[in-house]
UniProtKB/Swiss-Prot annotation:
Its main location: cytoplasm. This is 3-deoxy-manno-octulosonate cytidylyltransferase. It is found in: Cytoplasm. It is an enzyme of class 2 (transferase). It comes from Halorhodospira halophila (strain DSM 244 / SL1) (Ectothiorhodospira halophila (strain DSM 244 / SL1)). Belongs to the KdsB family. GO terms for biological process: CMP-keto-3-deoxy-D-manno-octulosonic acid biosynthetic process; lipopolysaccharide biosynthetic process. One of its GO terms (molecular function) is 3-deoxy-manno-octulosonate cytidylyltransferase activity. Pathway: Nucleotide-sugar biosynthesis; CMP-3-deoxy-D-manno-octulosonate biosynthesis; CMP-3-deoxy-D-manno-octulosonate from 3-deoxy-D-manno-octulosonate and CTP: step 1/1; Bacterial outer membrane biogenesis; lipopolysaccharide biosynthesis. InterPro entries: Cytidylyl_trans, KdsB, Nucleotide-diphossugar_trans. The gene is kdsB. It comes from the Bacteria. Keywords: Cytoplasm, Lipopolysaccharide biosynthesis, Nucleotidyltransferase, Transferase. One of its GO terms (cellular component) is cytosol. It catalyses: 3-deoxy-alpha-D-manno-oct-2-ulosonate + CTP = CMP-3-deoxy-beta-D-manno-octulosonate + diphosphate.
Amino acid sequence: MSTPAFTVVIPARYGASRLPGKPLADLLGEPVVQHVYRRAVESGAARVVVATDDARIESACRDFGAEVLLTAPDHPTGTDRIAEVVDRLALVDEAIVVNLQGDEPLMPPELVALVAERLDTDPDAAIATLATPVTAADELFEPSVVKVVRDHRDHALYFSRAPVPWDRDRFDGIDDGAVAAGGWLRHLGLYAYRAAFLRRFPGLEPAPPERLESLEQLRALWHGFAIQVAATDQRPGPGVDTPADLEAVARRLQSTR
């Protein structure tokens, strides 16, 4: 199956609490955002745009040849920032836009292409995302690991930090083997959107479950938009949230050179 034409937008904020300026943090001689940009280009995207709120990031991106837009500084979410980009680029409503976070230098390009492809082949979905099997009990019960439940069409029914679906008979003392065989899915935070949805998103009221779980994707479900969830066994490497993450990612990249 051929990959559709799609645009990748990389939101890159300067003001991260645990690692301020992380898009510009040095990673093997290049800023983190340059590694992310390279992954996006390798995905086969027709266009790659960095969206930032900071002139320093804008300047660095221009230095390595990226297309970059300086966006409004007060967007409440990264999705709102991407919605601004969609309007400024005058993308048609049917255009597919992939949101690749600016702190994911280990994201496999194949997954970027996959999420775009799955949205293209599901005309009923406004959004596509990815999930991978949960393989261990501590992963299943970890609130920072978001779980997703799908219907028979691979559309999301719900996302939660809780271990859903709940197995009322087996969760007491469940081991890794039972978890691996249980069919639970871990959400991967990579999204493809139709431009028409992104234009509507800023006007959607935040949903009660979204506030409770602190999961933005629940807003789309609450307002009736279908989310296609493609399963994959391929997991991206860790993102960069802390100085320790930066060191770990550097070691991993160094080992592949």
